[in-house]
Amino acid sequence: MSAKQKNYAIETFTEPERIRNFCIIAHIDHGKSTLADRILDLSGVIEHRDMRDRYLDNMELERERGITIKAQNVRIPWVPKSGAHEGEQLVLQLIDTPGHVDFTYEVSRALEACEGAILLVDAAQGIEAQTLANLYLAMDKDLEIIPVLNKIDLPAADPEKYSQELANIIGCEPEEVLRVSGKTGEGVPELLDRVCELVPHPVGDPDAPARALIFDSVYDTYRGVVTYVRMMDGRLNDREKNKMMSTGTEHDTLEIGVVSPGPTKTKGLSVGEVGYLITGVKDVRQSKVGDTVTLAHNGATEPLQGYAEPKPMVYSGLFPISADQYPELREAIEKLQLNDASLSFEPETSVALGFGFRCGFLGLLHMEITRTRLEREFGLDLISTAPSVVYRVIQEDGTETFVRNPSDWPGGKLQAVYEPMVDMTIIVPEAFLGGTMELCQSKRGQMKNMDFLSQDRVELRYRIPLGEIIFDFFDSLKSRTKGYASLNYEEAGEEQADLVKVDILLQGEPVDAFSAIVHRENAHYYGNKMAVKLKDLIPRQQFEVPIQAAIGSKIIARENIRALRKDVLAKCYGGDISRKRKLLEKQKEGKKRMKNIGTVSVPQEAFVAALSTGGED
């Protein structure tokens, strides 16, 4: 690659007509990161010897789980070999988006920074529910959609069938669907030429006050928060004072630049360009995704549209297995929060589990990733309590409370309880349709509609309570459909429901870690299941231990752990029956006394086992 060509993508203040901002919308495992690797490789911004798989996924966990958690971006030079712009030196800015349902807000901000999107679908699997949801987001924002089938080198690929499916969804001709292989690089140059031709160039007012959209922010140990922005109007220069419009805080710009493929310092950014700012801020919550950056002096008065605070949808308690790890857990969560503004937490005390934190997450994947990172990056051993959602409870006297934790459930009579609802989309092969519908109905789902995407794939839409799907819904769905179903959900208001709190009592004492808020119809099932499970997990004591499930003061299920008995008659060889009776009576008295004063200690392993499988049938 010539030196002249090598430099031009690193220089900023490019005319908007030469810029193309685009992203790749794809499901987990459909080859988005591999395609991004090929694009970087072909454009020559990375020397072949420096190339590594999943180049844009920086986090070890991202590479291992094969998912993109944070949005990344890279600026690359490209000279099209075909189409209307043949031979022109264009600048492509690829914004890599997270593909998972929990990170929809991040995806919508990243889409806001683009004018076009490559819809990437695995030629052996077809489109998945989450890709469909992100596609609709992109269509709402009027992005130019370029449909592409990836992995055409696979023996199982069926490009004819899935080209037709994509054409039906987007409303184009099957011939317009491009076919590429991220692995071999086949069709990738043609794809980039198509991007240059079809994606419109950015439009903005270069003379207006600066306005830049934050689409991601990452915490760097040495430089503080690195904020990724897309310039909408005006320009930002190095060493200027800037202002965040949602909070009104002002900062000095210590460094401004572009990513190509590593951070490269520049003099500034102008309309349509994507780059990064470093302001010395130490907390990502001060540099919020979706916020507008402007100049502190003579800045814009109107922020960009669409900013929203990320709202936790699922709550769970995290407790260290050994109490002396509590300070380390606090420090670890605070460090994670530096990089993840949507994670919220507050200290919580449980009688059974000791000190820990009640954490709020965007969804189940977010929760699992956070927990995995805490355990792996910080070496902690954790117990997480069963996930719960936020209920709005109106008591008899009209007071309204929001319950995030079963132990905060108010006692006495309640006027009404409202639970969060979600609109759920499931794409499933027709053969598994019956089992999937049965599962959704058992979880109190109301069917909204059903569409056949192709002859053998169906899209189902349900309105379902969020509390029903956060437990084991996904696992049950996968096992009923042999792993072929895909799922997406988005919040859809709230609805009144007949919910009760089920307490689990050991010897008449409630154990807070096992309490759950369930629908009245499922209360007996949950109570019986937990009682049977705990009977197997808690070791036998010297006295009989009753395990009970209760709603308020009404017992709905009971199991007994039989007492261990010493054979007091072992020494009696023959002799009078009254002697034996006396010994047995004496033992019985002792057991009775023990039962009154004895306490049951539940081993940690029992907590871990009961809570980790709390949602399974």
Curated annotation (Swiss-Prot):
Entry binding sites for GTP: D29, H30, G31, K32, S33, T34, N150, K151, I152, D153
Keyword Nucleotide-binding among UniProt keywords: yes
Leader sequence residues: none
Catalytic activity, EC: 3.6.5.n1
Gene Ontology, cellular component aspect: plasma membrane
Membrane topology reported for the UniProt record: Peripheral membrane protein
Matches recorded under InterPro entries: EF-4, EFG_III/V, EFG_V-like, G_TR_CS, LepA_C_sf, LepA_CTD, LepA_IV, P-loop_NTPase
Reactions this protein catalyses: GTP + H2O = GDP + phosphate + H(+)
CDD domains associated with the record: EF4_II, EF4_III, LepA, lepA_C
Family: Belongs to the TRAFAC class translation factor GTPase superfamily. Classic translation factor GTPase family. LepA subfamily.
Name listed for the protein in its UniProt record: Elongation factor 4
